[in-house]
């Protein structure tokens, strides 16, 4: 918010406070000043001058030679081509750039000649002085800026136009809507510099009459409009605002329009209370109804845009139609026009969340909506509407009808919190007396009654003792709070068991050449189709996002697989020949009610370790990564079993991961149809493992065995079996049949192709045999091998390969 420092002087003493000091102290007290700048910084050596004579240029049909009194001994001669400078302009006061003057944009003005006639400066238009439309009388918008006849001659133009002022640009946080006003910042300024602060109650004389004979107000949704205040002004005179008001509005970054609109903007800046003015004749039966909009209703707002309304929005209506979107913008059907004679001033308080939802839905963020969203004090509405009427009388812009319509359903009670000086000292690390704390709080409008802090209505952000303590710290000075070393006992942090397991799993993946990926928890329902899930699959039931970023982010995922395949596809599309990724992501399983996700119950969250790879690993190498993961986590009792029902995977190259017979995951080759939907070719591998189940299966005890004293004997075996026989089942048979001498068995080759009959495959294992107390003989090894081969032949019809 931009604020000219001179405006603060209406409410507090600013004498002796430099802009630099103001910037530093207000920022340290919590009201951050982004920038402080001088309004007239780019203007130098420009004064007011009175036109004494205007004659035609002898060698030009449009130039005029002027003599001007600029407060010096001799008049200054200036040649101008401005269309509004004529012999009739004699006596007018205007801005004059003297020799070696400067204008905004770095323009330098020096003496010169125009068509052979000396010109010792330049007469200025409002654009050349950096002013905007609305800051000057309409008659001066095309040509030289003429000033009021009472303007002194030879005066610095910066003082005349209100540019001899400093402006602070504040960054107001969302919890301090009271500081989005001159009065609010004046209160902060007075408290920070320990100066007096006062706000006069607006005084309205009125001209008689009774407002109730002109209009009525009905608030149907009091929860969305706690207070609605209105006054009527008749015999309105629409004209430019006085210079002092235009200058203040311009300094705050607001473009002046006319006196009535400017008054509403002025009061909003001064009090922080948005206002609106309706043309009374446009209100059917002089009636205002504050209600929810109806589906199908529409309104054209003051910016000329048509909007469709819904029943989630609050509207200001008359008997027939909406005339404003509450808290956002007025309607064009009740706009103040040049022929307006009677005006209704509205000053109301609207529910912040409703205004925010409405403004977002309509794509209309305004100065008013930005204030209402943060939560305003309902008690401001009365003072604001009276201040507007006071300004109307002060400017002679109309006649105020007696009476006020004030529909007040707001809570009349102050918020009260326990006053706990000792706790606040302990929290802040200070030793302030109770009297000191009370004094600091009272400067900000707080009161202490019966050991309670009475929170002022305008401080909607104060809810707890720590909030009150913060106010004490701000006024005491953050820079005065002594720095102290931490006095508590230092406790070494550690990872939780689940964090340790996740880090260990991630390490195994990285060591296996996998890169970590991270994806959104929001996906599109169409992704379930892409991974081949059946229409009746219960996993399709997902928690829906009410306000999604888009259709692709409309539900909470119940699987990470679509995100993994999408990331693999992204790499493949960018011609990356290989990619191996892992993600420790969360899935969200909803509570199902009547076949849908129950919106009143939060979904169950579960961590899933998902792996994906193409172009680098074979099926069995990928399986080896899973085995390494189980081994690193010290999980025993793990096994694998064929999985044919999972439609996302190839039915002949997919396995369930079991721990003590309970399924905790799946891995295998992605179904070619699914892979093709993602633009992937070749063998694409994936795995999905439940981290909670892995964590529960971790054996906390690790057993260490001494190094063997005797060597192992290694034997290889290759057999021919049907293609459908699972390698894991064969390995389990070998482990059981080979006896106690078997130390380990490892699958090292699976071959199908030349030399192998159709429907068959060659499977080769390496067996390691060892005895703890002796070196094994060939006979002992052969016996174990024969037992293993015999078991394979019996159970699977295996044929030993030569």
Language-model-detected regions and their locations in the chain:
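Extended, well-folded interaction surfaces typified by the phenylalanyl-tRNA synthetase beta subunit core
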Residues: 417-577, 715, 768-770, 780-802
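Phosphate-backbone binding interfaces of nucleic-acid-interacting proteins
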Residues: 1-209, 344, 363, 367, ...
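Short, hydrophobic beta-strand segments
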Residues: 3-9, 165-173, 226-234, 367-374, ...
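Glycine/proline-enriched, intrinsically flexible loops and inter-domain linkers
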Residues: 24, 64, 193, 197-297, ...
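Terminal amphipathic helices with adjacent charged low-complexity linkers/tails
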Residues: 193-219, 396-424
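A carboxyl-terminal module marker
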Residues: 443-445, 519, 591-598, 604-605, ...
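Conserved mixed alpha/beta core segments that line enzyme active sites in large multi-domain catalysts
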Residues: 48-79, 258, 264-333
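Mobile "lid/hinge" segments at catalytic clefts and subdomain interfaces of large enzymes
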Residues: 118-132, 139-145, 158, 313-413, ...
């Amino acid at each position: 918010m931009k604020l000219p420092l001179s405006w603060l002087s209406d409410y507090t003493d600013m004498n002796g406070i430099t802009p630099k000091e103001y910037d530093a102290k207000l920022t340290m007290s919590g009201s951050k000043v982004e920038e402080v700048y001088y309004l007239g910084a780019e203007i130098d050596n420009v004064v007011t001058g009175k036109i004494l004579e205007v004659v035609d240029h002898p060698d030009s049909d449009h130039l005029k030679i002027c003599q001007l009194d600029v407060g010096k001994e001799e008049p200054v001669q200036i040649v101008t081509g401005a269309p509004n400078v004529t012999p009739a302009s004699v006596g007018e006061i205007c801005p004059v750039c003297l020799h070696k003057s400067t204008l905004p944009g770095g323009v330098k003005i020096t003496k010169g000649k125009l068509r052979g006639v000396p010109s010792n400066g330049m007469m200025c238009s409002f654009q050349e002085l950096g002013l905007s439309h609305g800051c000057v009388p309409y008659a001066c918008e095309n040509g030289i800026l003429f000033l009021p006849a009472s303007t002194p001659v030879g005066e610095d133009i910066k003082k005349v136009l209100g540019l001899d002022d400093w402006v602070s640009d504040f960054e107001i946080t969302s919890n301090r809507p009271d500081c989005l006003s001159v009065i609010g910042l004046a209160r902060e300024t007075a408290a920070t510099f320990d100066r007096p602060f006062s706000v006069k109650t607006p005084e309205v004389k009125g001209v008689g009459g009774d407002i109730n004979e002109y209009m009525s107000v009905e608030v149907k949704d009091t929860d969305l409009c706690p207070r609605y205040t209105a006054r009527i002004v008749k015999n309105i005179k629409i004209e430019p605002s006085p210079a002092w008001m235009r200058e203040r509005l311009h300094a705050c970054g607001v473009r002046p329009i006319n006196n009535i609109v400017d008054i509403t903007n002025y009061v909003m800046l001064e009090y922080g209370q948005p206002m609106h003015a309706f043309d009374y004749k446009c209100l059917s039966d002089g009636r205002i109804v504050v209600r929810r909009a109806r589906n199908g209703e529409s309104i054209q707002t003051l910016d000329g845009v048509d909007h469709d309304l819904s029943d989630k929005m609050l509207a200001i209506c008359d008997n027939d139609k909406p005339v404003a979107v509450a808290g956002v913008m007025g309607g064009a059907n009740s706009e103040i026009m040049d022929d307006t004679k009677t005006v209704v001033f509205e000053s109301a308080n609207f529910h912040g969340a409703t205004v925010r939802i409405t403004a977002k839905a309509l794509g209309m963020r305004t100065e008013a909506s930005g204030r209402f969203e943060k939560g305003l004090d309902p008690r401001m509405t009365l003072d604001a509407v009276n201040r507007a009427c006071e300004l109307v009388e002060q400017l002679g812009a109309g006649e105020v009808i007696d009476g006020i319509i004030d529909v007040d359903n707001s809570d009349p009670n102050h918020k009260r919190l326990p006053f706990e000086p000792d706790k606040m000292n302990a929290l802040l690390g200070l030793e302030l007396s109770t009297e000191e704390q009370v004094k600091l709080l009272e400067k900000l409008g707080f009161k202490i009654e019966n050991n309670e802090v009475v929170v002022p209505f305008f401080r909607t952000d104060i809810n707890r003792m720590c909030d009150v303590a913060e106010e004490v710290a701000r006024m005491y000075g953050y820079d005065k709070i002594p720095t102290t070393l931490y006095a508590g006992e230092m406790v070494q942090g550690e990872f939780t068991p689940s964090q340790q397991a996740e880090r260990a799993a991630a390490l195994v993946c990285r060591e296996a050449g996998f890169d970590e990926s991270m994806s959104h928890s929001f996906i599109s329902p169409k992704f379930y189709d892409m991974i081949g899930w059946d229409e009746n699959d219960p996993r399709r039931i997902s928690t829906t996002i009410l306000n999604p970023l888009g259709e692709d982010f409309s539900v909470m995922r119940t699987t990470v697989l679509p995100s993994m395949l999408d990331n693999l596809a992204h790499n493949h599309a960018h011609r990356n020949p290989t990619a191996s990724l892992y993600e420790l992501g969360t899935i969200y399983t909803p509570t199902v009610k009547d076949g849908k996700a129950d919106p009143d119950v939060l979904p169950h969250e579960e961590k899933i370790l998902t792996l994906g790879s193409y172009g680098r690993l074979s099926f069995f190498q990928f399986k080896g990564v899973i085995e390494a993961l189980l081994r690193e986590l010290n999980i025993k009792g793990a096994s694998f079993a064929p999985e044919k029902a999972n439609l996302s995977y190839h039915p002949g190259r997919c396995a369930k991961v079991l721990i003590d017979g309970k399924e905790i995951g799946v891995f295998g080759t992605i179904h070619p149809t699914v892979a093709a939907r993602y633009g992937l070719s070749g063998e694409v591998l994936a795995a999905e493992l439940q981290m909670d189940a892995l964590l529960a299966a971790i054996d906390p005890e690790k057993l260490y065995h001494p190094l063997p004293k005797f060597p192992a004997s290694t034997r290889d075996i290759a057999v021919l079996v049907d293609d459908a026989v699972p390698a894991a089942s064969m390995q389990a048979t070998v482990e059981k049949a080979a006896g106690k001498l078997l130390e380990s068995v490892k699958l090292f080759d699976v071959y199908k192709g030349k030399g192998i009959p159709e429907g068959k495959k060659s499977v080769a294992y390496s067996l390691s045999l060892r005895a703890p107390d002796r070196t094994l003989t060939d006979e002992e090894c052969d016996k174990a091998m024969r037992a293993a081969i015999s078991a394979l032949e019996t159970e699977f019809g295996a044929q030993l390969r030569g």
